[in-house]
Amino acid sequence: MKADKTQIKRLLNTAKGQIEGILRMIDEDVYCIEISNQILASAAILKRANIEILDAHLKHCVVNASSQEEKEEKMLEISNVLKKVIK
């Protein structure tokens, strides 16, 4: 992986902390809307981490593919992931 590992790990650790906080909120019977807002915030951070990884894939794996066939394969991989992201 050629992505900025420090940035990715920071984002994922932030999401992890938020999810742990959400679990505590559930145990403490916090208002549902507040819990939902925290879930949305966690999902947004995970999405940012995914975008960073996909960006690195485009900049490194696709660009540096050794053959046209390999480039097409890498592009198909990212296309399939983007379809999932957009859903």
Predicted regions: what they are:
Residues 1-87:
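Solvent-exposed interaction patches of small proteins and small membrane subunits
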